[in-house]
Amino acid sequence: MRAFGLAMVLLAAAGTWSCTERADAQAPAAVAAKAEGAPYALAGTQVWTVPDPVSGREYEVFVSLPASYETSPERRYPVVYVTDADYAFPIIRQIARRVNLEGPVIEEFILVGLSYSRGDSGVASRNRDYTPTPNGPSSAKASLHGQGPAYQTYLKNQAIPFIESRFRADPARRVLLGHSYGGLLGAQVLFSDPTLFHSYVLGSPSFWFDKGHTMRVEADYARSHRDLPADVFMYIGAYEVPGPSPRNTDDADMVGDVRAMEQKLKSRGYPGLQVRSTVLEDEDHLTVAPVGFTRALMAVLPAKRG
């Protein structure tokens, strides 16, 4: 299975529980006077260090506030928590602004990017923190996977309280958005603590992990629960099936897995569940995310009309 690659690097902030405001790019004259170009920074974003006291790891969270945040001091906003923040945070931030240029399409929200643990590579951090069991791909050591439950506890006890104590967040309207292993993490939270978030975006979710572990967890949940109070949106690229193209997946039928999960969830008759999915044509595991992000935000946070 091809890994979900990183595409962008953000500036890091030093210090525990510290904040750095992003600055606008330097003026051309100042840049020209330097031997090297200045790093590109996203204006109006913040980086906070939120450590995990249990594991001792340090994580950064990236924050982008909506345009009306300062002018609407009484308003509380939904919060979108996105995994793989180094890649996804700048993309989602721009989508939210671009789509609304000619009128409201997506409701304004606070965007929170969940970055990787400091000192670890993105691959190592996500393999460890986003997976539910140690039983990863056969080529991987067991120690590299399986700490998703511990990371979920970190989100619940550290990251979310940090955000909600500092920003005007609506705790009843949290959204968790993840792609690939991030979608796998979302499914883990959905079936173990569904009310932690109101909406779940499971993008190209790795339901193949550990021989279909998530499918078994879904069945276990159904045996002991009569409701699943959540709004679930899944997206998948049409190429995410085995096939002759280099864009196809190596062996997992991820499209079939998403369809099977949607069918299973709908068959349960949970009164509090809304679930839907979309297969995006001419997209593969590495290209589908920007389109999937857009469709997902339009689905789970549609702008209020009138």
Regions found by a protein language model. Name each.
Residues 1-8:
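Bacterial N-terminal signal peptides that target proteins for export
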Residues 22-306:
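Non-catalytic cap/lid and distal C-terminal segments of serine-dependent acyl enzymes
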Residues 17-18:
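C-terminal motif of bacterial Sec signal peptides marking the signal peptidase cleavage site
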